[in-house]
Amino acid sequence: MMRLVRRLGLSIAVTIAAVGGVVGLGLRVRPKPFPAYAVPAPPLDTVEIPAGLPEAAERFARASMGEQAPVIHSAVVSGRGWIRLGGVKFPARWRFVYQAGEGYRHYIEATLFGQPVMKVNEYYLDGHGRMELPFGVVEGEEKVDLAANLGLWAETVWMPAVWLTDPRVRWEAVDESTARLVVPFGAVTRDTPEAFTVEFDPDTGLLERMVTLRYRDTEGERKGWINEVQAWMEAGGMLIPSRVTVTWEDQGEPWFSLEVEEAVYNVDVDKYIRAKGI
């Protein structure tokens, strides 16, 4: 009997190891990129960099855009990377659709062997957030709305001209390489401003990281939320981040890494931003 139990235990251990090995191989396979967003982008109008910016913000504006800032109304940004779910780092591909300063749709696929094993549609439209997750839908929560609004303004790093051209946005000086970015609320009424502390590279003037307090779920309090830029690329007459990591401060390591492969500006997204999937 004991010999049978030992053999059974060995068999189970071998099976678990084999399954774990197969899954490990699947996690190494990068998914194919999404098809290019096949809508021609129009030429972008430009305006002068506004006067009166804090030193760090003005240096960033000129380092990333030159003397003129493009006027951005919408964007479709696509790429790949990875997302950490339950402690496991899954390859991912994603497409984010924006109405500048107003709303977004996130479509994310976590993959195994290059095939989707989880699909997520997240929306921030008309000032309200909605998350369509495999285990249910989250909406109608003020904390979700506030978190989504901060997400919108953090992701505006892919269209940084909006931080200069939207009259609701305000920059405040901190020091030579740091500034405070104050952003509007969306549909939620609050007395305390929503703001990011934005740190810039003292040598290049380019943005290094954005830090704020953000809700992670509908139950807890705000937690430190960090967006860090790892690399840059040219798109739409601007330098935009080509690689970004997102970290909850109390977790100590990124849970999402995004590598941009395409950014298209001022295309019609009125229907696409309310759609599902790719």
Question: What residue ranges belong to the model's regions?
Answer:
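N-terminal Sec-pathway targeting helices
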Residues: 1-18
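N-terminal leader/targeting segments and the immediate start of mature chains
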Residues: 30-76
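N-terminal mature ectodomain segment of secretory-pathway/periplasmic proteins
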Residues: 58-137
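Short, hydrophobic/aromatic-rich segments at coil-to-beta transitions
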Residues: 71-78, 99-107, 174-183, 207-209, ...
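Short, solvent-exposed aromatic-acidic interface loops
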Residues: 110-116, 133-139, 212-217, 246-252
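Flexible, processing/modification-adjacent segments and terminal tails
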Residues: 130-189, 218-220, 276-277
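Gly/Pro-enriched, hydrophobic low-complexity segments
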Residues: 181-271
